[in-house]
Each structure stands twice: as C-alpha cells, then as structure tokens.
Amino acid sequence: MCIRDRPESLRSEAARRPIAEAHGDVMVVAAYGLILPQAVLDLPRWGCVNIHASLLPRWRGAAPIQRAILAGDEETGITLMQMEAGLDTGPILAMARLPIGPEETAGSLHDRLAALGAREIVALLPRLAAGEVVPQPQDERLAVYAAKIGKEEARIDWQRPAAQIARQVRAFNPHPGAWTVLDGQLLKLWQVRCCEGQGQPGEVLQASPAGIVVGCGEGALCVLELQKAGGRRVDAAAFLAGHALAPGAVLGE
C-alpha cells in the first residue's frame, strides 16, 4: 500500500501521527523542502529515502538544478539518499547521471530528472527490501551547497560575459525569470543565445525580427524571447512590432 501526503510541517506529534499509524516500510521524499525531524526519520522500517536532483555531494540544498546550470556543469543526475538529520548529508543508495544540454532550461531539466528519479526509485525499492543495497557515505570534501534562488539574483548584470548571462537566463526559466530594465520597466528574458557583437554592456547593437543583439562585458547576446511587465512571452519580432527599440538603447537602466 502506498500513501501520498505533503504536510506543511512535521514538528508536532499530531502531524506525525498519520505516518506512524501507517507502519510503513519506507518513506520516499521528493522536492519536499523541509528537513525531517529525527522522530520522523525513525518511523519507517527501512528509513526515509530522498530523491535528490543532483549528483551528491555536489549541490546539496534547495536549488540544485538552477545551480548546476548556472555553474556550467555538463552533467547532473539523481541521487537516492538515506535521509538523516543533516541537509542532504546521508549515505548514497543509488545514483544515475544525465547530461545537461547546451540549451537546457531549469524547467526542461527538472522534467527529465523527475522522470529519471521515478525510474530509479522503482528499481531501488525491491533491492532495498531484499537487503542488497550497501549505503555509501558522501565525501564531505566535495560538498557544494545549492542556496535558494532569490529574485535579485535573477537580475541581469550586463557587465558579465555573454555566456554567463545565457546560463543565468536558462537557469531561471521558468522561475523566477532572469530580468533587466528597459525605460524603467521590468523586462524578463526567456530565450537568448551568444552571438557576435561588441558594444557597451547593456547596449542594444541590433534590433531585428531575428533577435535583439545586446552588448555584454564580454561578447554579445541575441535575445529571442522576452516579456514586458504585465505582458506575455513573445518572440523578438512580436516585441519589436509593439515597441520602438533602436540601436543605442540601453538595458539595465
């Protein structure tokens, strides 16, 4: 029998009672966001297994998918971990790797990792029941923390290299959305690519239906999809049809 639940808190005995009364063999945790108290970890016969969206111990914490893309990692994966009181510190039960594509967004990578995690946990549980799994401790020397993403972190700094900003746009798609300012109004960028061009950081070098080319601290970005405050996501051609944007305009001011 499988019981699904997402309690807002497990601090109280009343909140933990349904888990205790289920007399479960194992509890599987995915994208829960809270550290489980030891009283909960001790309830299932085989403990609690977390499906974590990174190759632990790299990217422990709340935002492993976004951090992997921001860092330019070429691969990530799923770690099935025996949960303990620390934050993503428990021994590893299984691991599966996945390449990060050059145009990968946090949204697309999340979906691929979710599918991979589902397959891996289904494969693990019978082995766990049979006593065939040998937990492997994490190497603390390799631990990297994936801090929670804040809105201000999604603000584009045009002084940075184009490749770094492109990763930022992909990492924050769909949430919270990488953003800049145009004429005092917030502007979110959803799809960009690095391109040739040289100019001042944030300067519009070219504005055509094929894309809006913007200078960066190193190189340039071609903006392909964007969204003004209160509007919808549109391609460059649709945006320019409704907005006068000429070379020389500056983003970020």
Predicted regions and their residues:
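One-carbon transfer enzymes
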Residues: M1-P176, Q206, G219-C222, K228-G230, ...
